[in-house]
Amino acid sequence: MWKSRRAQLCLFSVLLAFLPSASSLNGDSKYMVLVPSQLYTETPEKICLHLYHLNETVTVTASLVSQTGRRNLFDELVVDKDLFQCVSFIIPTLNSPDEEEFLYVDIKGPTHEFSKRNAVLVKNKESVVFVQTDKPVYKPGQSVKFRVVSMDKTLRPLNELLPLAYIEDPKKNRIMQWRDIKTENGLKQMSFSLAAEPIQGPYKIVVHKQSGVKEEHSFTVMEFVLPRFNVDLKVPNAISVNDEVLQVTVCGKYTYGKPVPGQVKISICHETEAGCKEVNSKLDNNGCSTQEVNITELQSKKRNYEVQLFHVNATVTEEGTGLEFNGYGTTKIERITNKLIFLKADSHFRHGIPFFVKVRLVDIKGDPIPNERVFIKAQVLGYTSATTTDQHGLAKFSIDTAGFSGSSLHIKVNHKGKDSCYFFYCMEERYASAEHVAYAVYSLSKSYIYLVKETSSILPCNQIHTVQAHFILKGDLGVLKELVFYYLVMAQGSIIQTGNHTHQVEPGEAPVKGNFDLEIPVEFSMAPMAKMLIYTILPDGEVIADSVNFEIEKCLRNKVDLSFSSSQSLPASQTRLQVTASPQSLCGLRAVDQSVLLLKPEDELSPSWIYNLPGMQHNKFIPSSSLSEDREDCILYSSWVAEKHTDWVPHGREKDVYRYVEDMDLKAFTNLKIKLPKICFDSAPMSGPRGKFDLAFSSEVSGTLQKGSSKRPQPEEPPREDPPPKDPLAETIRKYFPETWVWDIVTVNSTGVAEVEMTVPDTITEWKAGALCLSNDTGLGLSSVVPLQAFQPFFVEVSLPYSVVRGEAFMLKATVMNYLPTSMRMSVQLEASPDFTAVPVGDDHDSYCLSANGRHTSSWLVTPKSLGNVNFSVSVEAQQSSEPCGSEVATVPETGRKDTVVKVLIVEPEGIKQEHTFNSLFCASDAEISEKMSLVLPPTVVKDSARAHFSVMGDILSSAIKNTQNLLHMPYGCGEQNMVLFAPNIYVLKYLDKTQQLTQKIKTKALGFLRAGYQRELNYKHKDGSYSAFGDQNGEREGNTWLTAFVLKSFAQARAFIFIDESHITHAFTWLSQQQKDNGCFRSSGSLFHNDIKHPVVSKALSCLESSWKTIEQGRNANFVYTKALMAYAFALAGNQDKRNEILKSLDEEAIKEDNSIHWERPQKPRKSEHNLYKPQASSVEVEMNAYVVLARLTAQPAPSPEDLTLSRSTIMWLTKQQNSNGGFSSTQDTVVALDALSKYGAVTFSRRQKTSLVTIQSTGSFSQKFQVENSNCLLLQQVPLPDIPGDYTISVSGEGCVYAQTTLRYNMHLEKQQSAFALRVQTVPLTCNNPKGHNSFQISLEISYTGSRPASNMVIADVKMLSGFIPLKPTVKKLERLEHISRTEVSNNNVLLYLDQVTNQTLAFSFIIQQDISVRNLQPAIVKVYDYYETDEVAYAEYSSPCSSDKQNV
């Protein structure tokens, strides 16, 4: 196809070459037509016509010619003798984003004919789109909020339909997608929730425009703790190689602006030298420290580098907490310690006119150096000079170019003289020098015009800028009476302004010279850069010109102001945010905690940022073909000499008018002299840039015009550059700490004002607020960033452990900080509670003085008395008192005189947690049915730890629906386990939809869980499209066949509900296909840590299944129960009813029928503990195979028979008894398959209740509770605590319909030695308290081996609970993942979880470190639990204590 297109282009180019392109001129008529080199569709564009000395009426025609034909732009009849006028036209939309086309300009009259073409780029009008997020960095599990903004190039809002937007994770997985997003008044707000364990790193929001152009915005996902304070490090940008001291200033400031007390460590390192210099100091009262660091030993004088660096690091450690934050900086070591900067030196010079140079001499800090000699040399001219810098470091020179005929001027300026140190060998100080090259402006007559750019500053909008023009005209001017200068101003690739100036020529004046001023209005449309071209035409047809660029203020028409009612507010107080903008503007507001921006700085929304957006950039058009303009013949050298009477020949580097026009991004159609003449010798063109044209023509003729060319132009370098008063004694209880406070859209009223009342969050910080507003009249406006300090004169911080064990005691500490400049008398109080006892430590609780900018800590020795969550409320209040504080009178602040902090502590019982669940499915039909239940406790139960509750549900899936993200009391840390967070939501949605019970609330919740599970599962994807339990782990693991098939199936089902990138399904399917053998079976690949489902019949290939069934049928081995169940379901899915029936019949012979239920058990079960009071829950594989039997019966074709439903119900009765308290089962895969079976059974048998069901539970004592179940509350989980444990209860059900009853019993039991499937040994290092380190930090060492009935366990979880007040040292835990047998580690609030692939009889040993966070007294032992993930009855317990747990010293 490409070759065909190239051939068409080639033929088209050849045909175009035969179209009229020569000029036929009459008399002195002159033509100059200027048009932008890039034209935009659906936008008014201008072509400027300049015709004069016409002696007849002519018609000017402009048209575009492309492969699709010719489009006429305009026909203009010109009757005037002289004309300078711009004509507007509009080009219709293209079918492609852009096209290179030929623009033809034809001028025809009775005796005139002029035709010329040039290549231009026609582009469809493009919108400007960008994305703003509510913050730059997110934690796992947080919601990413963002808004899409759409505008045209004038920055006015668009109601644009954007076809596609998506979020891409660091592995380029598309994790969320939206289609057909419609912006309203230029704005669309959207959000997306991150998974609890997403891939961490840089994410992208990608938005596609209708043209196919993509706009991207990045954000970061990472685990972080917001910095409490900022470290500001100041070092010089550069120092001399001879400097011996480096001044370093470090300041620590809290986010609310107050100084940080503490220490600072400064480290200075040379980038190429070993070793560093360190200095320690204390921060002063302002939170700062300035140090003069001797760096002599770090300096080097012999290095092969022009510039080297010092890397400076400052670590500030907060007093009291030990928190550390860093600041970084670099300082250059330069041997050129002074610099010469050209302030004025044009890029081009004019022969015969002085060339002015102005330079500034500055030192290494950028400060001007006065009274120093500066030398200048222009070697080609033989010009040398010297002068002394003035008080501003300036030196000025004027270079005479009279008699100079060269094409370039090389200028060098020096400070002092020659260097004693050359090249890069040494690091001694060198003297400053600078060079500049200027090229000649071409004019055969030596006539010139020159525009003076008086200032290098940025031009402000809405003002008049005066441009001064100087000119000198030589040569034969004849009887010229007046001279007209024409000018154009361009911005963003379009002609913005035009005008002219007439100069009267005095008779006999020669040469003609003078100057004049042009007043240019600076408009919004000219930003960020405007270009001005001025030219005039001499009588002989020569054109002289000049141009100048202006940097324009990046201004916005819509003036937006944002303000808070006060710049400082108390936490939890009311404030008002006011926005002023153009009337009816739509404004997006944002306010972010400054701590977030300290953690991850971002580019601030500003006019500069807007004008640098890709959609605002004007790209220079470079034609893809050498046929972009008509060929021109060269002039023979002999003719040149005869005509011009000179043997001087242009060199080719001079700047002619053609290049001035080209630099303006204009195309010129003219019969005037605007180009350097091309001189030929012996009919051959001169060598040089333009001499290559003929060769280029022959080699590139096939590429004349390109539609949607891939050779895109490069962007130009951007220019350098009050609420009602509150009771001041109102108490502040701080509990709301968002990272983004304001993220909202408001509409400004007709007077241009919008006000929003809001509550200040409880975070003591500085909030950074901003607004962007869009108006149909004035476009986009941005406010400056407005701070609000959420601050109170004093506040209290409370520290306590995450949890303690009953019987332990800990020190609760409350630190009060005073940030007023005066002293206060304070009282601090811990609110009394029956849940704990608190003994004050010290005598300062009633009243004490707190000095200005001081802090004070009060302590209580606390012993909890109740189990569960215990609240601690600490209040501090400034008191009115006549008693002085030292020599000062104690003051009381007007507002914020009391601060209260409430924190929660978990108090746990000692021992091992146990849970038992008793489930019953009652299906009543008028007659009452009942069941007795006994709750008993073991003799080793921990006192007061037992609790139980009874639940009633009207739907078989009620419990699972309520707990879809917490179905198991187990971790979910691998790819297979994550699917239990994903797949059940599909079954729930399908079931509720089919039974017409799906509410919007449940749907929203389930869709959120599906999206989170989808994100998490992508963590475990391999590059080849497969999946494994722990991902590829840098290529060390291969994909797992079973898990890949499961993910493929689940993703395919989830497509009906959420976005799933189709590539993930395609890649998984392709990988699975590659694993299939010739016989239809699949190669078993990768590790699956559930040994009981590692049978080869995972294949869905029927030929493989047929062969497997024959083997099983012949063997009659009971080991194949699981296999039969799975095969029955597989044949049912494949539609092979005969095979399904045959296998189900075989299974019926092995079924266990008891208690009105039917189920199947596997042989060779692991032995059960003799100490079990209750029948244990069925194993994972047994639940799974029974669920497969139900699924096989329900997948009958065309529908399940009454017998299928009856038998399924009997198995469902057994399955429901295996559910845990959250609606899940034993493990992950059994939960997924069983919930699938329950949902399908429920959907098939669902019917609306005709009568209410009445459920009653009563004890042998006085307790009795009734529940009603009806259609309106079928999904409601009704619950009541049970008072008598131990105790006997009776459950009775009457009415009509099925109800699901569940009793959950929980208690703790003391650890006792018993037979288990694992040998577990735990000890601490050091073992005793002899080592002082044992108080605060020690190592936990574990040894594990498998002693069960199988050769090896399944995947094993080691759950290590932390001692109260201790936390794990995370790096030492993470390091365990390097061990071969540990695939993953997790650190939660109070536990460390270790995932072991499997455990054999070979002992595995590993250890990590824990350290004390808060001191706890009477420290109780902590439990370590090791269990088989899929055989949860295989479990072992051990306990450990602190080496110093028996230490009786005070805490």
From Swiss-Prot:
Disulfide bonds join 48-86, 251-276, 269-288, 461-555, 587-773, 634-680, 849-885, 923-1274, 1081-1104, 1298-1444. This is Murinoglobulin-2. It comes from the Eukaryota. It is found in: Secreted. GO terms for molecular function: serine-type endopeptidase inhibitor activity. Residues 1-27 form the signal peptide. Keywords: Bait region, Disulfide bond, Glycoprotein, Protease inhibitor, Secreted, Serine protease inhibitor, Signal, Thioester bond. Glycans are attached at residues 55, 294, 313, 500, 749, 776, 871, 1401. A proteinase activates the inhibitor by specific proteolysis in the bait region, which, by an unknown mechanism leads to reaction at the cysteinyl-glutamyl internal thiol ester site and to a conformational change, whereby the proteinase is trapped and/or covalently bound to the inhibitor. There is a cross-link at residues 974-977 (Isoglutamyl cysteine thioester (Cys-Gln)). Residues 703-728 are annotated as: Disordered. Residues 713-728 have a biased composition (Basic and acidic residues). Belongs to the protease inhibitor I39 (alpha-2-macroglobulin) family. One of its GO terms (cellular component) is extracellular space. Monomer. SMART domains: A2M, A2M_N_2, A2M_recep, Thiol-ester_cl. Plasma. Residues 677-734 are annotated as: Bait region. InterPro entries: A-macroglobulin_rcpt-bd, A-macroglobulin_rcpt-bd_sf, A2M/Complement_sys, A2M_N_BRD, A2M_TED, Alpha-macroglob_thiol-ester_cl, Alpha-macroglobulin_TED, Ig-like_fold.
